Amino acid sequence: MESAMFGLETPLMTALQHLLDIPDGEGGAAGKQGATGGPTRAYVRDARAMAATPADVKDLPGAYAFVVDMPGLKSSDIKVQVEEERLLVISGERRRGGGEEEKEESCKYLRMERRMGKFMRKFVLPDNADVDKISAVCQDGVLTVTVEKLPPPEPKKPKTIEVKVA
């Protein structure tokens, strides 16, 4: 049953759903299909996490800027790719930190509110985007992907055709 229907989308309910995940065994391609033929809980959870990655898209005079909050992530956790020539894909995975206090056996979480797991955003780039001039910078937990624009095509000058006398 969907917990969001009852307003129970809380860290506790998310943790309970995670605990109730049953291994899929041989349930379909890439873990997308469970034993019952429907999507697995893990697949649905990942799809939800991917859809919950907010981004700002800016149209600047010479470039497009895609701004995504990435708190606590290292550059090695983030992947920026261009697929099928015009599809910008920003993806990665957030993991729990492995600090010394978490390695102790006596450590237990009293509250788990930070979102962990996979994230992904896809953007179709405009025709005037220069896919060969893309840069990505992650500073203070904010990823900025800049895609430069191609220069506008020069207007075609009319071609004059000489009329000959026959």
Curated annotation (Swiss-Prot):
GO terms for molecular function: unfolded protein binding. InterPro entries: A-crystallin/Hsp20_dom, HSP20-like_chaperone, Small_HSP. It is found in: Cytoplasm. PROSITE patterns: SHSP. The keyword Cytoplasm applies. Residues 46-166 form the sHSP domain. GO terms for biological process: protein complex oligomerization; protein folding; response to heat; response to hydrogen peroxide; response to salt stress. Induction: By heat shock. One of its GO terms (cellular component) is cytoplasm. Its main location: cytoplasm. Keywords: Cytoplasm, Stress response. It comes from the Eukaryota. The keyword Cytoplasm applies. Gene3D superfamilies: 2.60.40.790. May form oligomeric structures. Belongs to the small heat shock protein (HSP20) family. This is 18.0 kDa class II heat shock protein. It comes from Oryza sativa subsp. japonica (Rice). The lineage of its organism: Eukaryota, Viridiplantae, Streptophyta, Embryophyta, Tracheophyta. The gene is HSP18.0.
